């Protein structure tokens, strides 16, 4: 197909600059407006993908009442430990941390990630009551427990999670109650709930403009000169510089992305129920609880994924479909 007079540009500028994420732990920039008391997110590890058969419950679908195929993602959900509480106040430049309190007894593995100073150790929960009038938001500092999974590491990830509730006093009472305790995913989410997934995508390394931006491959003399996979024109003579909008080669993948309105199909506590023959590729067996999410989730195996309550939940027109089968066949190719 030849060049048209008008056509959309190749690739999207929405996520520019396309560079590597700073951290493997995704940064959560927004939270659901939920009045339910409890945590609004939960960190998990991606085990792998498989497929399931669901009973179609859309009455207008030609497959209504029949089994339909759907890809599903299995995420391992080891318990998280609540290590601290942080109170935020409102300023002209946004939220500012007023004070924080750490649990007296900490997991020794947390020392691999951070060190709680003596100044912070002596603070008690009464210091949170002292700034209650100035507090507008309350969050807890939790860490994962990867040593209980098949992932070969002990160093935990630390995530800050917002506490939901109708009032600050209600949030504070809940945060005090869970300080120093471990929580499971059943304390945060339930089957059938819509969630958002936040994670860093698979890294692809340095890629050319054809794969990175989707520019057209040039034929004829361009192919003979060996420049068929390069951008045809990188801009005019003036201004004497290359615009940032020009599709060029560079980093592809390893970006933080958020996918909205994934649905929890199943929550389980025994990993053997969901582990396929031979284990998941590059992961192994699921040893803790798990969650089965409809569709795919960004990132490779072993990647930390934060499940957040849906910030713009979809309308649940037909309810949760019945799951009749989840494949446990070998993913090893034999």
Curated annotation (Swiss-Prot):
Q: Name one GO biological process term.
A: translation
Q: Which GO terms describe its cellular component?
A: cytosolic large ribosomal subunit
- A GO term for molecular function: rRNA binding
Cite the entry's keywords alphabetically: Ribonucleoprotein, Ribosomal protein, RNA-binding, rRNA-binding
Which InterPro entries does this UniProt record tie to the protein?
Answer: L3_arc_euk (IPR045077), Ribosomal_L3_dom_3_arc_sf (IPR044892), Ribosomal_uL3 (IPR000597), Ribosomal_uL3_arc (IPR019928), Ribosomal_uL3_CS (IPR019926), Transl_B-barrel_sf (IPR009000)
Annotated segments matching region Disordered: 1-21
* Source taxon at top rank: Archaea
Biased composition (Basic residues) is annotated at 1-10
Q: Which HAMAP family match?
A: Ribosomal_uL3_A (MF_01325_A)
Its quaternary organisation is:
Part of the 50S ribosomal subunit. Forms a cluster with proteins L14 and L24e.
Question: PANTHER family per the record?
Answer: 60S RIBOSOMAL PROTEIN L3-RELATED, LARGE RIBOSOMAL SUBUNIT PROTEIN UL3
Per the record, the similarity remark reads: Belongs to the universal ribosomal protein uL3 family.
**Functional description taken from the UniProt entry:** One of the primary rRNA binding proteins, it binds directly near the 3'-end of the 23S rRNA, where it nucleates assembly of the 50S subunit.
Q: What is this protein called?
A: Large ribosomal subunit protein uL3
């Amino acid at each position: 197909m030849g060049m048209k007079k008008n056509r959309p540009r190749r690739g999207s500028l929405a996520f520019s600059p396309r560079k590597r994420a700073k951290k493997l732990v995704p940064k959560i920039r927004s939270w659901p407006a939920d009045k339910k008391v409890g945590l609004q997110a939960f960190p998990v590890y991606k085990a792998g993908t498989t497929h399931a058969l669901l009973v179609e419950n859309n009455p207008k679908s030609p497959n209504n009442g029949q089994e339909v195929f759907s890809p599903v993602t299995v995420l391992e959900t080891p318990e998280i430990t609540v290590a601290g509480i942080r109170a935020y106040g409102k300023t002209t430049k946004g939220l500012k941390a007023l004070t924080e309190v750490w649990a007296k007894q900490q997991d020794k593995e947390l020392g691999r990630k951070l060190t709680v100073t003596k100044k912070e150790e002596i603070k008690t929960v009464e210091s949170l009551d002292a700034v209650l009038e100035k507090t507008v938001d309350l969050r807890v500092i939790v860490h994962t427990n990867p040593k209980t999974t098949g992932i070969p590491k002990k160093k935990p990830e630390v995530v800050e999670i917002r506490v939901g509730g109708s009032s600050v006093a209600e949030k504070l009472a809940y945060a005090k109650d869970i300080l120093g305790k471990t929580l499971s995913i059943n304390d945060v989410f339930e089957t059938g709930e819509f969630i958002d997934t936040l994670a860093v995508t698979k890294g692809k390394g340095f890629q050319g403009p054809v794969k990175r931006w989707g520019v057209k491959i040039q034929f004829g003399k361009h192919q003979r000169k060996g420049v068929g996979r390069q951008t045809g024109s990188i801009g005019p003579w003036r201004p004497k510089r290359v615009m940032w909008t020009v599709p060029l080669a560079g980093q592809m993948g390893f970006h933080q992305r958020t996918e909205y309105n994934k649905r929890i199909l199943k929550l389980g506590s025994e990993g053997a129920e969901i582990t396929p023959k031979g284990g998941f590729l590059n992961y192994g067996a699921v040893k803790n609880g798990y969650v089965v999410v409809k569709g795919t989730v960004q990132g490779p195996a072993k990647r930390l994924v934060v499940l957040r309550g849906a910030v713009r939940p979809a309308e649940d027109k037909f309810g949760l479909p019945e799951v009749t089968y989840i494949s446990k066949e070998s993913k090893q190719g034999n």
